[in-house]
């Protein structure tokens, strides 16, 4: 490719709406353009990188026997209603109606569609297992799209689905996808971590996420260096001991005036007690009714864990105005005493350790002190429903180490669905004994457009993007520093022609602009290797420079073949993550 023919509208200025480095550099580098909030066009450079990512994904899918299909974007509402996800998925489901007033959604994921498709195809145990995938555009009505292509309304995703007659077969496929996903990240050339994950709105019994490590990653990851335990913040457990202090005597519960103190900090300060003595009461609401979650005052509730424990993905934090209307009290004074019986109370394990605690009194300006769980108020269920903290004990039995925290960007997630969808949609097969049984399923998602943003987020510097060679828009850039010098131009052309013939993805910057301008653009778009042909050509020397290194190397230029061999060797050893610290 000649830069003079390339449509790559690079920008010097940072976009005014930039909220993350990857968005800034993809815009400035001419890879993408914003159409509206969360909706982007991919320009030639951006689409070229996307296609290279897709190719790696396709090859790894084919290695494990997954066959490519294409499913519809528009999904009939009745299929989502069959599984209950029409309501449970929440407002992120982008719904629409046709001219006949029939309801549809733009697919964020395809479990219902693929299950409906296969229920009419797979009838006998002899037809299993089946492994299918697609790469397609998906839609999610994000409440606040942000971080560029990392959290968009419209995005490109690879989703795969496997169908089995038993769980042993499912486990085998799950491991195949686990290995394939690791291969994808390794082939792209990124630092990553695999973590235990919450199944969320997809559902199922078991899941792992694949995170690209990045300082500005949107996801928190907790891990143990000693035993290798790792989990997303939504799933992470700890080995903290929440035993009761047996030396402290139980006291009589008493209502006290706490005036205008509402928050945990205000109440603790007013009563001159530790936040660990307070029991935070949080009201949640779903289509199934009200839930009160209790947690120790110094911890934060983990909504994903509550949803998982109660098997209710529609649970959300209740609106304070709805709480006031329903219970006649502001959220700062709610508590489990005198709460109606139809409100389910779930308590974090940390509440077990609180003796003579402080809770809201369900009336304005009042709290109870010396309150004790199960003696003074009911609890329907104890469970782990909090976010862990860095420095807590590792949950692995016998490890005795502590958890550390880092940040990452989720690019892939795999799920063991079991019969979650097949049982609800009556997708059954006849087994060897003539009995009908529901399909056992797995699903496996990979965010193609998210990977684009994640790469840039991990690999960049003050000059621009540092693409790994596997997905770089070009592997090599040839830069003739003076287009009016015949020797420089002819040598550059000779090198360009040879590299093209040898199959190198190469660009020559043949624009009539200054050398400095060329260097800035080539660095901005992140080409791994630069071949700089300048005035030293008269001495038989040219410069090679790697994108991830500050200094270049002057080499003797004898012939194009020898230069090609040197560049090829540099490309083979090129690893911009080598000195990366995250």
From Swiss-Prot:
SUPFAM superfamilies reported in the protein's UniProt record: Class II aaRS ABD-related, Class II aaRS and biotin synthetases, YbaK/ProRS associated domain
Keywords from the named record: Aminoacyl-tRNA synthetase, ATP-binding, Cytoplasm, Ligase, Nucleotide-binding, Protein biosynthesis
One Gene Ontology CC term in the entry: cytosol
Main location: cytoplasm
KW Nucleotide-binding (keyword) present: yes
PROSITE patterns: AA_TRNA_LIGASE_II
Superkingdom of this protein's organism: Bacteria
Protein's UniProt keywords contain tRNA processing: no
Family under the similarity heading: Belongs to the class-II aminoacyl-tRNA synthetase family. ProS type 1 subfamily.
Record note on quaternary structure: Homodimer.
Protein known as: Proline--tRNA ligase
Source organism: Petrotoga mobilis (strain DSM 10674 / SJ95)
Organism lineage: Bacteria, Thermotogati, Thermotogota, Thermotogae, Petrotogales
């Amino acid at each position: 490719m000649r830069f003079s023919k390339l449509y790559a509208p690079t920008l010097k200025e940072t976009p005014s709406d930039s909220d993350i480095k990857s968005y800034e550099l993809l815009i400035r580098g001419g890879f993408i353009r914003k159409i509206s909030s969360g909706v982007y066009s991919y320009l030639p450079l951006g689409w070229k990188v996307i296609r290279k990512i897709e190719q790696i994904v396709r090859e790894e899918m084919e290695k494990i026997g997954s066959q490519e299909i294409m499913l519809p974007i528009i999904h009939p509402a009745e299929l989502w209603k069959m599984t209950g996800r029409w309501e449970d998925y929440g407002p992120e489901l982008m719904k629409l109606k046709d001219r006949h007033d029939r309801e549809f959604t733009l697919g964020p994921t395809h479990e219902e569609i693929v299950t409906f498709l296969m229920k009419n195809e797979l009838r006998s145990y002899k037809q299993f297992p089946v492994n299918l995938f697609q790469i397609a555009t998906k839609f999610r009505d994000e409440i606040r799209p942000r971080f560029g292509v990392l959290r968009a309304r419209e995005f490109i995703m690879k989703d795969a689905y496997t169908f089995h007659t038993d769980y042993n077969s499912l486990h085998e496929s799950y491991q195949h996808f686990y290995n394939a996903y690791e291969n994808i990240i390794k082939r792209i050339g990124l630092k990553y971590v695999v973590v235990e994950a919450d199944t969320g709105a997809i559902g199922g019994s078991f899941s792992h996420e694949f995170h690209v490590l990045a300082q500005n990653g949107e996801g928190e990851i907790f891990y143990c260096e000693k035993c290798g335990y790792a989990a997303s913040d939504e799933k992470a457990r700890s080995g903290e001991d929440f035993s009761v202090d047996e030396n402290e005597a139980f006291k009589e519960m008493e209502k006290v005036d706490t005036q205008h103190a509402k928050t945990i900090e205000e109440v603790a300060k007013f009563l001159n007690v530790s936040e660990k003595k307070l029991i935070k009461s949080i009201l949640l609401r779903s289509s199934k009714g009200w839930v009160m979650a209790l947690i120790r005052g110094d911890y934060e509730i983990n909504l994903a864990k509550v949803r998982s424990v109660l098997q209710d993905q529609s649970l959300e934090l209740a609106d304070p105005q709805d709480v006031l209307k329903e219970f006649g009290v502001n959220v700062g004074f709610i508590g489990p005493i005198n709460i109606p019986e139809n409100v389910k109370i779930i308590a974090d394990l940390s509440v077990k350790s609180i003796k003579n605690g402080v809770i809201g009194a369900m009336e304005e300006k009042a709290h109870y002190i010396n309150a004790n769980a199960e003696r003074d108020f009911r609890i329907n269920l104890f469970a782990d429903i909090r976010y862990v903290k860095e420095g807590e004990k590792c949950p692995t039995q016998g490890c005795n180490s502590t958890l550390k925290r880092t940040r990452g960007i989720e690019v892939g997630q795999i799920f063991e669905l079991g019969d979650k969808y097949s049982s609800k949609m009556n997708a059954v097969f006849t087994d060897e004994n003539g009995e009908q049984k529901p399909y056992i399923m797995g699903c496996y998602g990979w965010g193609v457009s998210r990977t684009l943003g994640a790469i840039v987020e991990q690999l960049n510097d003050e000059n621009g993007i540092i693409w790994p060679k596997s997905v770089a828009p070009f592997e090599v850039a040839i830069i003739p520093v003076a287009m009016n010098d015949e020797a420089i131009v002819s040598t550059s052309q000779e090198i360009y022609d040879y590299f093209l013939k040898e199959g190198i993805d190469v660009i020559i910057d043949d624009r009539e602009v200054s050398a400095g301008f060329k260097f800035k653009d080539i660095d901005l778009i992140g080409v791994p290797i630069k071949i700089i042909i300048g005035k030293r050509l008269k001495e038989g020397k040219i410069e090679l420079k790697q994108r991830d290194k500050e200094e270049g190397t002057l080499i003797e230029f004898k012939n194009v073949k020898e230069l090609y061999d040197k560049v090829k060797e540099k490309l083979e050893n090129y690893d911009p993550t080598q000195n990366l610290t995250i």
